[in-house]
Amino acid sequence: MHTNRCFSRPSWITVAGTLLLGCATATAEPPQEIEGLKQTLERTGVFFRADAPYVLRDATDPFLPICVEIINGVEKTGRSAISKIAPYITREPLKLEGINVFAKPPGARRQFASQPLLLAGGGELTFDARAEGQPLSLAIRWRKTLEIPRAQLADYLRQHYLGGPFDVVDLMVSIRVVGWPAQNTFLRARDNAPPLPELPGWYRGDMHYHSAYTDNPAERGHPLSVTKQAAVETGLRWVVLADHSTELNPASYAQALKEIRQLNDGGLVFIRGEEITAVSAKEGMLTTVHLVALPCPDDPERGFPPAAGSAETVIMGGDGSVGNPAVPLQAALSRIAAAGGFAYAAHPFDPISPILRGGTWDLASDFLAPDGMGLQPGLVGLEPWNRATTVTADNARDPYCIQRDSDPAACFQPDKDANHYTRLERGIELGWRPLLEKGLAENAPSPPFKVLLAVGSDAHGDFNYEATMDAVDFLSKPSRGLSGYAEDNAFGKLATVVYCPSGMGARGENILRALQNGQSVLSNGPLLVAGFDLDKDGNLGSEGDIMPGGRAAWDAGAIPPLQLQWASSKEFGPLASIRLIVGTRRGEAGAQEIPVPAGKEIESQGLVPIDLHSYMEALTAGWGYIRLEARTRNAAGEEFRCYTNPVWVRVTVP
């Protein structure tokens, strides 16, 4: 969860700010200012959103989906602190005339044509909401997915612009409401993109996604039907629905499962999970943390009942704010474990809003069991790679600077504090390495306890980019707390890639087993896997082979070669670096570079053996582990990465 994500302004935060401003200045302002304040209050909380996948990889889908959503007021559901003020906010219905979609090639010098893209039936609007000339009355909420034929989009661009064909398209989605200025959102999509790099038996997915079942004034996802379409377009094969414990209930959980059964097929698998807001066991005021709960691999539809046969399938609680307490972390983990499920600590070292008493995970109090000899029951790892952010923008409606008059300074700019690699490395340094070391130290000479790594987009819809309210660092840049800002994170940019040699399972059973056992790697493009081909059949993953998440023991003179396999593409660039890291009870030795064989920079073309003897000098007593990192760089200079989960090994000296 990236707290207080929102896609339109003004928001609930603006309500408070505007009321304070009004109380302070009303007596001194001229009539026109009072009228302006009145109009602001009348429109506060009205929500407009347009979204579309940032990339289209599915050649079998002839459409570009554009999601449009309008909410006339504040949601009155959920158990967040914000929802408590919702019953006091009412407004007149909105009058929707329709929606226009305009398209152009990228570049600020090219402007949108005056004529919108018209679908079958003609008229003056891409979508006409009127009936017999009368606008559509929207009392509370309205959603629509416009399916734009990609062939028609290409024809439209050829008609209006020279220099095609265009694989990257800028879009303006214009919502027309009576009495309102046009509500324009600017998007960018890449069409006809190639498939993602693949390796046999490995499936990309998002372990942390919020659907429309996350629905409050600060954070909203998209319906499952269009989420499936967007997931396939971006190259994902499975998605865990990690909607918030502050909003889920047994009825919504059951409804989600009903939808999942209708949508799951061989192309995409949904798994019903939950992001739980919990209270850390450490002392202090800022103690709210999050975890992603995943169901039992043997019964993915069971949920997290406190006892067999119970109808309480979800773990419900507050958001952690004053007067709205969250569930204790240990109680949540105990219930997850009792139901046969497991959990990852979600963004454990990223800040959560102080409004929600947000804190970070504590190694001793939260990760470790009371005796320190393992992780807390139910916990298998952490998710420090969260949100694929490299740049941010103050302009949340046009972060790409698509309009000619956009301020470049307000468009996407590098942001070192938000950079996902910076946050990932911090999470590895603060959490993963110390916990891995602890596992080796506490369990010697027994096999160490495992600590696994995962990644998730934490997208709330966010098919194109993420528009959010900054409720964490709002004092340093107040405009982002009031007006919002954008990040380039998007659904499909990050993936946990799991090994499922027998397929994903109709309900995701094999995906869950791989996540529980660490048979997974983390990637935002290239793939690198490593293991030991013990049956010497030239493949990794046969019965008896050692894969990521596995354990093995050998005499020092009998260590088999470590087999590597990788795949990248022109989009992500050739492998620039393969780094092998060996960990012991004394910590991790410095990363050692493994040369990439000439001619195999894009694809390993089978297994590549690595003699480990020169790398394993540190492993002369007790258990240790091996993990790898790969980095690529494309022609545009963009860097992409892949991280493997460890293989735990014990080397004995005769």
Regions flagged by a language model, labelled:
Residues 2-14:
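Bacterial N-terminal signal peptides that target proteins for export
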Residues 250, 318-487, 570-590, 618, ...:
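Domain-core and long-helix interface of multi-subunit machines
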Residues 197-366, 376-377, 383-392, 425-430, ...:
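A metal-dependent hydrolase metal-coordination microenvironment
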Residues 26-28:
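Boundary at the C-terminal end of the N-terminal hydrophobic targeting segment
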Residues 30-199, 435-654:
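C-terminal functional module detector
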Residues 14-22:
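Bacterial N-terminal signal peptides
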Residues 306-314, 398-399, 511-517:
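Short intrinsically disordered coil segments
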